[in-house]
């Protein structure tokens, strides 16, 4: 029987990831008009535009309608203003009002947002990870500020695995190549397999996500290759399944498998 194009894998070797590109940032607007604006210090660690926040609100509505908040066990976010604002706006708790006894994910007006504080109440944990940052080099909009500054703006986000307070990864030149970003993407996916969570949201950037997706699907049909190669729009969400076809992860995660033979008895292999 021809099973070409079909894959069958044990569920405990699969994870679901929801890839999200950040909403519109001030650098996107400037760069659309003049690409050289990406090299301007005016857009250092760019924050979201008012339109970008509208996009976040719409994504938030979708996340709730699709009941993703009931499924997502962890939100991984690139440590940049625009990605963090997108992540907490889409996956965070309600507006932090009435003195709710929960550490805020975002304080009021963080990053010139003109938005109220966002609570961590009833939201999944958030983890900042440098591996999923945007293509590094040349563009100041892709250089992060200190972790100390971010912690003051986003108190409930876990920045503990970021090794240095200041940004030591971004260099003025050269800018990372697509091949380098793709390699970083593969490293990121391998790291995902060290996590116990089975369903994870990842809020990142166009260049990184394109590099990541371009690393996979080489053995797929042309339509699927094309689907993987399309750049994500601002605030777009794409859900994917990743499969451990080697032994990258562990079998410690919960599984729906059941061992059988409880209680033990005769076990005829013919039936």
UniProtKB/Swiss-Prot annotation:
What InterPro entries has UniProt attached to this entry?
Answer: His_Pase_superF_clade-1, His_PPase_superfam, PGM_Phosphatase
Q: In which tissues is it expressed?
A: Expressed in the shoot apical meristem and meristematic zone of the root tips.
Gene3D superfamilies given in the database record: Phosphoglycerate mutase-like (3.40.50.1240)
Q: What positions are marked as the site Transition state stabilizer?
A: 205
Q: Which SUPFAM superfamilies match?
A: Phosphoglycerate mutase-like
Q: What is the induction note for this entry?
A: By auxin, sucrose, oryzalin and the nematodes Heterodera schachtii and Meloidogyne incognita in roots. Down-regulated by abscisic acid (ABA) and hydroxyurea.
From what superkingdom does this record's organism come?
Answer: Eukaryota
CDD domains under this entry? HP_PGM_like
Pfam families with a match to the protein in the record: His_Phos_1
Q: Where is the active site?
A: 22, 134
Q: What does this gene product do?
A: May play a role in carbohydrates metabolism.
The similarity annotation says: Belongs to the phosphoglycerate mutase family.
How is this protein named in the record? Phosphoglycerate mutase-like protein
